[in-house]
A protein has these predicted regions:
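Surface-exposed coil loops of outer-membrane beta-barrel proteins
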Residues: 203-235, 242-332
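Short loop/turn motifs that connect adjacent beta-strands in outer-membrane beta-barrel proteins
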Residues: 80, 86-92, 118-144, 177-190, ...
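Outer-membrane beta-barrel "beta-signal"
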Residues: 59, 482-494
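N-terminal periplasmic/intermembrane-space "pro-region" immediately following the signal or transit peptide
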Residues: 7, 19-151, 155, 161, ...
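Residues on the lipid-exposed face of transmembrane beta-strands in outer-membrane beta-barrel proteins
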Residues: 146, 170-178, 234-238, 291-295, ...
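Detector for outer-membrane/organellar transmembrane beta-barrel domains
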Residues: 336-438, 452
Length: 494
């Protein structure tokens, strides 16, 4: 079947909807990416008004969702040379990125907005200053997301090992748009990620709740500690054909692009167990040399492929120890629908992977879906399922896995906390993992977990997140059948 026919067939199953262009610029609240709205002047956080005029806003994107037309139009209305003819040459360090198709836009364009609507504290010096810095750097093509957090974790009942963990963890991801054609059809950019963390009463490299429990899953998805600052991602990219195609090569964190899900946005604002952040059965390497390409021919379909090495250690030269015996290939196809059987928007992803681990080739596949529960509902359902053969499972320690759950996003109140924010939510998740034979000896073959998490936005850039998990039958536990993992973290999102 031709690509155009596929796109038309998928589009026929959706309900088209676009936001009308506005004559006068207004601030946009992306509303978790599902239903962007123009904010009334009284709704705009003072820190946002003081730091950036509405005409310069490029709203924050949400990975796992196609960027809404109203948000993309913010960028296009500011493009240099738009409407001018003839158009010649390239723009270097442009203040706006080149064109990307909507799903790819959410992956590669961070935006220049960090201040969120908030019903508790709407102005503080930290938020205003952070927004000014973000706006200034975007004038030179650099857009980023900076997460800074403090996390406290306790295990109950207590194990024979360490039971409480206090740590600071930080992550910076960004895209530096280096140059683009003046008609915005193509461009060159640099992607990067820097992570660093430090346990205040333990070493993040030697100890964790995971090691104390003997679990296959990692309840502390926030841990970023390595040998100082390390770079999981540093790659040069190119986009062309009006943003329909992207190619990128260098040191890659594959999990930044594949296996996204809007209802499990990761440890800072979503469920904190690492098994909910990405499919635990799939190998999604970071800090490894590789190549990634993405293609979105129409709004309702995309495809991605990545290939990387798998044996590079933290902060090691990515060219060291390169071997065809430690290599990974993964492909993903995504089907994006505005309405599925009247339930609302949904995205369904299929994944296939080949892994060479120590000279043994293994295969696996995964399924990843996100689905609104009711049209325009703040309630959403997510699930990931993955199966690997024994050779592929040796690379992750997981032969099969399934995670599923619900997220209730704001707004779920008329006023105050939970009325408007892109972070306020309550999430519930269930996980199951079956250990690979490479994990022997093991006390249990199957491991289960439950997690309940909530996010309370306090200032335009800071939220609190209490979280409780119960891990049943940890794979390597010999002294108990399960334990609670209690966490509290405070997070700045700049």
């Amino acid at each position: 079947m031709k690509v155009t026919s596929l796109c038309y067939m998928l589009a026929a199953t959706t309900v088209a909807g676009t936001a009308a262009a506005q004559q006068d610029p207004s601030y946009i609240d992306t509303s978790y990416g599902w239903r962007p709205v123009l904010m009334e002047i009284i709704e705009v956080p003072v820190s946002l008004k003081d730091a950036m005029p509405a005409g310069e806003q490029m709203a924050r994107r949400h990975s796992g969702l196609s960027t809404a037309p109203a948000v993309i139009n913010q960028t296009r209305s500011r493009d240099e040379d738009t409407g001018k003819a003839p158009c010649h040459g390239w723009r270097f360090l442009p203040s706006t990125p080149q064109k990307f198709m909507p799903y790819l836009d959410a992956l590669f364009v961070p935006g220049n907005t960090c201040v969120e609507p908030c019903g508790i504290i709407c102005q503080d010096m930290v938020s205003t200053g952070a927004q000014k810095i973000k706006r200034f750097l975007s004038h030179y093509g650099f857009q980023y997301d900076l997460t800074m957090s403090y996390n406290y974790t306790a295990i109950h009942p207590r194990t024979r090992h360490r039971n409480d963990f206090s740590s600071f963890n930080h992550s910076l991801t960004g895209t530096w748009f280096l140059a683009k054609d003046c008609d915005n059809s193509q461009g060159v950019f640099l992607t990067m990620e820097a992570d660093w963390g430090q346990g205040t009463n333990f070493s993040e490299r030697r100890s964790s709740a995971q090691s104390s429990l003997g679990s296959l899953c990692n309840p502390q998805g926030s841990l970023r500690g390595g040998k100082g600052v390390f770079l999981p991602q540093l790659a040069l990219g190119y986009s062309g054909f009006d943003g329909k195609w992207v190619a990128m090569a260098g040191t890659l964190d594959v999990s930044n692009y594949l296996d996204q899900n809007a209802y499990t946005p990761g440890w800072a604002g979503g469920l904190m167990n690492q098994s909910f952040g990405s499919n635990p059965a799939l190998l999604l390497p970071w800090a490894n040399l590789g190549f990634l390409t993405a293609w979105q021919p129409c709004e309702n379909f995309y495809a991605m492929y990545a290939t990387t090495s798998t044996n590079t250690g933290v902060n090691q030269n990515p060219f060291s120890d390169l071997s065809a015996n430690y290599w990974m290939h993964i492909a993903e196809a995504g089907f994006i629908m505005d309405d599925v059987l009247g339930m609302g928007a949904g995205t369904y992803r299929l994944q296939y992977t080949m892994i060479d681990h120590g000279g043994d080739m293994g295969l696996g596949f995964g399924l990843n879906l996100q689905q609104q529960v009711g049209k325009n509902s703040p309630l959403g359902f997510f699930t990931r399922v993955g199966f690997m053969d024994q050779d592929a499972a040796a690379a992750t320690g997981t032969k099969a896995a399934a995670t599923a759950g619900l997220m209730l996003q704001a707004p779920f109140r008329k006023s105050g906390w939970g009325s408007r924010s892109n972070y306020d939510n309550v999430s519930l998740g269930f996980l199951w993992q079956r250990a690979a034979s490479s994990e022997k000896p093991m006390a249990n073959k199957d491991e289960y977990g439950l997690e309940l998490s909530a996010v309370v936005q306090v200032t335009p850039t800071f939220f609190l997140q209490p979280d409780v998990q119960y891990i049943f039958n940890p794979i390597h536990a010999t002294d108990k059948d399960g334990a609670f993992v209690l966490q509290m973290q405070g997070v700045f999102k700049f």
